[in-house]
Structures are given as structure tokens and as C-alpha cells.
Amino acid sequence: MSDIETPDPRAIVLDTVAKLPNLPGVYRYFDAENNLLYVGKARDLKKRVSSYFLKNLASPRTALMVEKIARLETTITRSEAEALLLENNLIKTLQPRYNILFRDDKSYPYLKITGQKFPRMAYYRGAVDKKNQYFGPFPSGWAVKESMQILQKVFLLRTCEDSVFANRTRPCLLHQIHRCSAPCVNYISQEDYALDVDNAAKFLRGRQTEVLEVLQAKMLAYAEELKFEQAALVRNQINALSRVLHQQSMDTGGDADIDIIAVIVQGGRACVNLAMVRGGRHLGDRAYFPTHVDNVLTNAEESVAAEVMKAFLAQHYIDKFIPGTLILNTEIDEPELMLALMQQCGHRINLIFQPQGPRRQWLEMAQKGAEISLARLLSEQGSQQTRTRMLVDALKIDVEDIEAFRVECFDISHTQGEATQASCVVFHHHAMQNGEYRRYNINDITPGDDYAAMRQVLMRRYEKVANGDGVMPDVVLIDGGKGQVEMARQVFVELGLDISLIVGVAKGEGRKVGLETLVFVDGRAPQELGKESGALMLIAQIRDEAHRFAITGMRAKRAKARQTSRLEEIEGIGAKRRQKLLARFGGLRGVVDASVEDLSSVEGISRQLAEDIYKQLH
């Protein structure tokens, strides 16, 4: 009886390639261990995928990856734009080894002007709607707040919460320092306030000259009507706006919305510096540092910088605002990519590679910013990598990829058993990863039982991981001694996880940094690294960050509980009435300051109940 022949994986792959359709779609390469190597998109799947299996590949890195391909998957899409969207979702979710990856950042902030009778100006992150006006996006929260300060100085728009606005009886401090026109107490008519809002919107859209002309005409009209007080107020607006325009060192020469993007590659890393011009004002920049740059599959005629630029355009703009003009320091020839992006945003995008005048200065500044940011990263990275390596060596951990070394640290925080919270912070890629931090509200335990709290958070965190859903870290750091570590061991045994990953950090005498002892549960003896140890300094940094994160969450939870608890103790005050009181008076402090008459004016609050509330709170 003859042996059954094992199919050749390469033959299966080539057979799959031969049967691919000439349609747009996304392809995925896997190695023999089912690890995802690469995700790509194509206008013609058969033509694009076949090009990887030619005998003479231009790039050695591409040839190295192709040798590892043991399986191929494809997904057919209706268009290349749809393929682009799917490709980037897969890259962000699955993080293939040979794709350049830009980590998801927090959403960009906007400046929002609400659509109310007297609109409010506010800092905003999140999805936009059609009920309000949104300006941006801005590269940083600081840029939004600076713009808000300008609008306060020039147009005196309100920033107060609606609950505060609805219940004021006299102007606040902002009116006294000429930062608000006090619409809350009718110091300005709805028509005049609407005009200020309209001028503010024009200013943000880059129509500053038009705003100045409108204000000057308004001032002259008041003067002709002998309304000198109103004319003086408009004159003050004109002076404030003129000062702002004079201070704007970045004169756009009429441009409205532009993004300037500079890519620098050095030392196996890359920096993409994105500068933003919105409404004709240069708002600053933000640096991005993609990973997997050293695995870029470059073709002979394409540079690594061009590949990074293409990856940034695809991953960054696929779900974000795209201005009509992009100024780039690296030339790319990707008509399909730009067509897909234009289909996504619904307008034409103009690419400029050789700008002139002020635009050239912007690009040079963006490029210089990228160079400085990358130099700083490489310097810090050398130090960070050294500390990471020292920690790995001190714990005698066998780590395949030091870049992927991951630590998760847990801490419990409460005040005499009240508002117990657990925190989990993450150290990955040689740095703390704020976006992966998590807080856990701890319930159904005896107040002050830290062991039960630790058990609950570890079970909630790693039960999914044990079932194959999630990432297991290389080290699980527990802020505590033998008791906490033993509780962690019990959880890991129940879940069938490796107990050698658990490391406890027992505080030293006087809780001084450098005197900590590392505690293990797999038979290793306790270890004191010494206060000069770089590994211990890294452990202390991670542990302290977990402690800080837990305390801030606990304090917020405690404050929220205390804000409502005094009202909850009053008979006749249920959830709905409590909510109405807090909304009407802007919080518990406002309820305490309210008179019996004010309290009884709230819907659902009788005179007798108002008197009861007043007595209970005083």
C-alpha cells in the first residue's frame, strides 16, 4: 500500500493564483504557521498577485516574504475604493508583519458651535452631525483651545454649559473681563449675537477680511445713528481682530484648508509629520511613527519614503476629513489610491510636490519637524530598548521579538472600601500605551478586600484571553506582595494560563523606590534588583503609572457618588427628580445654593418638598 503524498503548499498557492479573477479585491498571505504576513489591495487580483511569484523579484525583502507564503486568501470587492477600505481595516486589526502600520490615534478634536438660540462654543471629539457647526479637525487639543480663546476675545461667544446658562441671574466673570457678551442675562440681543456667531464662523473658514469689512460697516452705521456706546463695542472687536491677524505669523495668502505632509526615514524608522492649515490659519503639526518600516516591500523604482507616504494617506484619510489640497515632500504615483480617497470624501484632492512661496516654507518647516521628531525618537528608543532588554534579562524571559515585549500591570485603589476600582496599564513597544489602559469597577465584594478585587479584575481581564480572544502579555505585573500574587496564581490556574508570567512587586521599607522585591509563584526565589537597576526603574515606572491611573479613576467615581448621595437620602427624591435638580442647577453645589423658591420652580418639586430639600442640605 503506497504512502499518501502530502500536497506541496507552494503548488497549492500557485494553483490558487492561476484561478484568481481579473477583479478588484484584497489579498492576504500566510506562512506555514498560519501567521499573517501581508495584506494588499488590487484593481486586478490575478495580475497583482501573480507579480509576486515571478522569478526575478526586484526587492530582496519581497523575495524573502514570498518564500514564506504557504497560503493565500482573497476577497473580491465591487471597486478599488471598497478594496482600499477593507485593506486598511484588516491592516489596523490584524497588524501583518510586512505592512507599514500606523497605530490608531485618538480622534482629532473639533471646535463646535451649537445650533441653539444662543449658540455655545465648545471643544469636541467624536462623530459630527448636521445639528451643529464643526470646524477642524485640529492637530491637537491645544490648537482648538487657542482658537476658542481668540473667538472669546474677538466675538465674545459663550462657552458655559446649558444648565449654567439657563439659570444665571447675573453675568459671570468672563463678561467682566470682556470674554463673553452675557447672552444668559439678555445683555445682547439674539440678532446681534447671531451676527457675532456668523462672523466667528467666517473667521474660522478663513474669511477674515470679509469679517473686518462687516464690522467696520457696522461701527460706522452705529456712529451715524449716534449710538456711540455700541460703536465703541464694535471698535473693540475690530481692534481685537486686527491684533490677532497681526500675530498670525503664518499668512496663507488666501488658502483655506491644506494638509502638509513630510516623511523622513532613518535608522530603520520613519516619521510622518502632518501640519494643518484650517481656515487660512496654520494650526501646528503632529508626528506619527509607523511600525514595520524595516520590513517594507519596496520595488526597485520606489523608495521606502514613498511607501510610507502611501500607507499614511491610505490609513489616515480613509475615515477622516481630507482637505482639498495636500502638499507632500515625497512624490507618489498612485492614481487608484487618490481616486478611492476622492470617492470616500466626495471632492477633488489636489497633490502638490513642488510648492512655491509660503507653501514652500510650510513644507520645509514640516520636514524639519519630522527630522527633529525622528532624531528624538531614535535617541529615546535607544535608551528605552536598553531598559526593556535589562528587564527581560533580569526576569530571565525568553522573548522572540523584543519590539513586541508586552507588560500588563494591575493595581487596586479605594478609600476605606469606597469606590473600589482596578486599573490595568500596558507597556508595549518600549513605551506606555495610554490607548490600551482600562479601568474596572469592582462590585459585590467586602469593602476593602483587595484580594477579592484583584481576583475579580484578573478573571475579567484574562477569561477572554484563555478562550482565545485577546493578547496574552509576556509579564503580568501585580502591585502587591505574596497575598496578591497568590490570588493571581489561583486565577491563572483556574483559567489554565502560564503562572510563570506573574510577577509581584512588594514595596520596600518606607515604600522607597529601589527597595522593592520581586515575588514569583513558579518556584523562583524573591529577587531584589537594587536601586541602580534599570530593570527596576522600568518596573517602578509601570507600577507607578498603574497606581496613578487607578487613583484618578477612583477619585472620579467617589466624587460622582458623593454628588448624588446627599440627594438620594432625601425622601421623595427619586432618580428622575434628582436628575432634573442637577440639570437645572448645574450640579449639587447649585442645588445647595438654591432658595426654596428656586427649588419649587423645578418641575415635579412641590413647595413642601422644596422646603424638605432645603432643610436636608443646610
Swiss-Prot record:
**Intrachain disulfide bonds:** none
Q: Which GO terms describe its molecular function?
A: DNA binding; excinuclease ABC activity
> Which PROSITE patterns does the record cross-reference, listed alphabetically?
GIY_YIG (PS50164), UVR (PS50151), UVRC (PS50165)
Which keywords accompany this UniProt record?
Answer: Cytoplasm, DNA damage, DNA excision, DNA repair, Excision nuclease, SOS response
Q: Does the keyword Secreted apply?
A: no
Record-level GO BP terms: nucleotide-excision repair; SOS response
Compartments, record wording: Cytoplasm
Q: Which GO terms describe its cellular component?
A: cytoplasm; excinuclease repair complex
Residue ranges of the UVR domain? 209-244
**UniProt key word Zinc:** no
Give the matching InterPro entries: GIY-YIG_endonuc, GIY-YIG_endonuc_sf, GIY-YIG_UvrC_Cho, Hlx-hairpin-Hlx_DNA-bd_motif, RuvA_2-like, UVR_dom, UVR_dom_sf, UvrABC_protein_C
Q: How does it assemble?
A: Interacts with UvrB in an incision complex.
* Family as reported in the entry's similarity comment: Belongs to the UvrC family.
Its biological purpose:
The UvrABC repair system catalyzes the recognition and processing of DNA lesions. UvrC both incises the 5' and 3' sides of the lesion. The N-terminal half is responsible for the 3' incision and the C-terminal half is responsible for the 5' incision.
Q: Could you tell me what this protein is called?
A: UvrABC system protein C
